[in-house]
Structure formats: C-alpha cells, structure tokens
From Swiss-Prot:
Gene Ontology molecular function terms on file: carboxylesterase activity
Protein name: Esterase FrsA
Organism ancestry: Bacteria, Pseudomonadati, Pseudomonadota, Gammaproteobacteria, Enterobacterales
Xref: Pfam families: FrsA-like (PF06500)
Name of the coding gene: frsA
Role summary: Catalyzes the hydrolysis of esters.
Top class in the EC scheme: hydrolase
Catalytic activity: a carboxylic ester + H2O = an alcohol + a carboxylate + H(+)
InterPro entries: AB_hydrolase_fold (IPR029058), FrsA (IPR043423), FrsA-like (IPR010520), FrsA_esterase (IPR050261)
EC id: 3.1.1.1
Coiled coil region boundaries: none
C-alpha cells in the first residue's frame, strides 16, 4: 500500500514546473546591479528579468500589449519563488511570465488562422512568434516551459514565411564532434540567387527568429539574404555550450556555405549583436578569406569580460544568462568571472593584432556594457575599420539610422 501511495505521489501530474529564476544556482556575492541600456532595456527592482520594451517594440510588438501583459503578471496574487520579483510565479498559470506571453501569442495565432488576406495573416503569425519568443526569455537551459514556447515561436515563424513576400529555407549544418544544428536562410524577393548573405551572430538572450525586422527593413531591400543560427545552448544549438572558442558553431556553418546554392559564398559578411560581436570579430580573424566584412553593434569583446568595475553593472539575470550558456549554473560569481576573462578577444591575443577583414563597430555613449573604447579597439585592429557613434536620444530613430548605415556598409563590402 505504501509503495502504491509512493508511486501515486511520484507520477501524479504536477503543474509546478521549474521556475526560471531558480535554474541558475550561482552563489551570488552582491545585490543585483541596476542597468539601463538601449540594447538590454532596464532592470526594475521588483522584476527578475530585464524589461526591454524598446527592442520588443522594434521587433514588432505593440507597446500597449507589452504593458497589458506586464500588468497581468504584476497583479497575480499567487505563489512566487521570490516574493520580491513579480515574474517568478510558480507553475504554468495566470501570472506566470511564460503563461501570459504564450497566451498573448495564442491570440495572434488564432487571428492568423482566421485571416483570409495572406499578408495580414503572415504578419499575425510573426506577432505570435514574437510573443512566444518573449515567453521563453531569457532562454535559460533547462527551462522546460520556455523550450515549449520556443518551439511555438519557430513554428509560427515558419508559418509567417509561407504567407509573406520572401522565402525561408530551413538548413541543417553538420557540427564536428556532436549534434547538427538548424539555421534559417531568409531569401529576399528582390534579386536572384545566389544572394550576397549576412551571417547573423545574435546576443545571448535572443533566438534566431528575433531578427526578422533586420532582414525585412534593412537587408532585403538591398537584395541581401540573411542566415541565422541559434547561439550556443539556445534553440537548435541547445546541445552545445558556449566556450572560449565562441565562434565554433558559426565557423563550421561558414565553411559549409559553398554547398548552399542560394548563397553566394564569396559575398558573405557577419553581423554581431552584443556578445554576438565576440563571435563575429573572432570569425574576422579566423576566416578572413570567407568574410567580406564584419559589422558590430554594442560589442562585448573585452571590457565586460575582464573589468571588475564594469561587471558591477551587470544584473543577476544577465550573469545567469552567461552562466547558463557556459554550463556553469552552479558556479560562484568569482569562479564565473575568472572564466569570463578567457573569453576576451584581447586576452586571446586576437584583438590588437592587425586584421585584414574590414570591420565596423557602432556604440552608444555611456553604454555600461560596451564603452566607446570597446568599439575603438575593434576598428583600430582592422586594416579597414569604421566607427559609428550612436546618439542616446532619440533612441528609436538613432537605432534605425545606425542599422541603415551598417546595412549600406555591408552592401558596399559585398559588391
């Protein structure tokens, strides 16, 4: 009888999935820092996650809906794993971060299914994909509910491409020593294959499906294709952890582009966003014969990885993301920061050496994670470098103008 009761307890359906903020068990040594950044958004004292309405709106999410979802999470009077943080509701139910964003995505998915006009329906599917992606944010390894939301995002993203005026090719790439990964190749309506192509190197807290706006508004009008893959330990790259060889996955993809008929492998550039710049700049040194240029936005290549005063500005969630990607979920802050030092491209002996690959770097004044000196280091290391200063205000139009400049620069390098 006791055995039967034990089995009943063990196998009884449970709605208490692991809650996101509990997945990284770092021995924290400080009160979480505050951060206000254009690319990361803001830390708010009563939220675990950094709230990034600017970038979410840039991706296509209505700011009114963002506030509505955040309000539903904020008013939930149910069990939290940490009573200080509004977004730590236990279980998949009302008030839970993942539940509320998925719920909003489902509304858009239903509208997409009911829509007769293909262009409108495609946009509705994209809306759904964006909400599902935010549901999984910050995409920590082992977050079961987030992984389900990410699968929904991928499916909605693929459905959108069937209705909108571009082609999406799902490509599989072999990776030496382990599991293959899947990438999305976005082909523009303008021009003919093989296309000049931008290899996207995203930030550590985003999915490869989060960069559609970059393709639609900045690359496709120039007849440029975009190839995305997930960063290590996220999405289809789930089985790979981030190592000091940060460009490992992207480099293997780059070497296989000769086999992709839609890509002009002799006209390829890389675009690095935040930590993705670490990947892109590393590729500039390791694969100069395969890249026409590298563009970076708010790069993280040295200072944040080595400087203790800069690391003091890094909030818990961002450190959790780094620890999760590196497979160091149980490490202390001290051990994690010692390891981060080896991820610096200057420490590795790359940055500071002359690089033949053209490199562009854009920075914001007073960016706590990527100061001007970071971008200057990249530009001065290239034999053909260009520096872009991005005004802090007006935020949205400055971001837009910077992306326009960068897309024109990449187009010019791929002539």
């Amino acid at each position: 009888m006791a055995q039967a009761n034990l089995s009943e307890i063990l196998f009884k359906p449970s709605f208490k999935h692991p809650e996101t903020s509990t997945l990284v068990l770092r021995a924290r040594s400080k009160i979480s820092a505050e951060l206000h950044s254009t690319l990361e958004g803001n830390t708010v004292s009563n939220w675990y996650r950094m709230l990034n309405p600017l970038l979410w709106a840039w991706r296509g999410v209505d700011p009114i809906e963002i506030n509505e979802v955040l309000a539903r999470i904020a008013v939930a009077d149910v069990e939290h794993t940490n009573d200080k943080w509004l977004d730590t509701v236990v279980g998949y139910r009302n008030g839970n971060w993942i539940y509320e964003w998925v719920h909003q995505g489902m509304l858009w998915q239903q509208r997409a299914l009911e829509q007769q006009d293909p262009l409108t329906g495609g946009q509705y599917w994209l809306n759904a994909a964006n909400f599902y992606s935010i549901a999984g944010y910050p995409h920590l390894k082992g977050d079961e509910l987030a992984e389900q939301a990410e699968a929904l995002s991928n499916r909605a993203y693929e459905e959108a491409a069937l209705l909108l005026p571009y082609q999406l090719k799902e490509l599989e790439f072999r990776i030496e020593g382990g599991s293959s990964i899947t990438g999305f190749l976005h082909l523009p309506e303008k021009g003919e294959a093989p296309f000049p192509t931008v290899l996207m190197c995203g930030s550590l807290d985003t999915l490869q499906t989060d960069y559609h706006r970059l393709f639609r508004d900045y690359l496709a009008p120039h007849g440029i294709a975009m190839l995305t893959i997930d960063m290590p330990s996220i999405g289809s790259s789930y089985k790979w952890k981030l190592t000091q060889d940060s460009s490992f996955l992207h480099q293997q993809v780059l070497t296989q582009l000769t086999t992709v008929p839609w890509i002009d492998h002799q006209r390829v550039t890389a675009f690095g966003f935040r930590f993705g710049a670490n990947v892109a700049v590393r590729l500039a040194y390791l694969e100069p014969q395969r890249l026409r240029g590298v563009a970076c936005l708010g790069p993280v290549v040295h200072r944040l990885l080595c400087d203790s005063s800069t690391q003091k500005h890094v909030p818990d969630m961002y450190m959790d993301v780094l620890a999760s990607r590196m497979g160091m979920a149980n490490a202390s802050d001290h051990v994690l920061k010692v390891e981060l030092n080896s991820y610096s491209l200057k420490t590795q002996g790359l940055l500071g050496r002359r690089c033949p690959t053209p490199m562009l770097a854009g920075y914001w004044e007073q960016d706590p994670l990527s100061p001007k000196e970071e971008s200057q280091l990249i530009v001065s290391s290239s034999m053909d470098g260009k520096l872009i200063a991005i005004p802090r205000k007006p935020v949205y139009s400055s971001f837009h103008k910077a992306l326009l400049q960068m897309s024109h620069w990449m187009k010019d390098k791929m002539r």
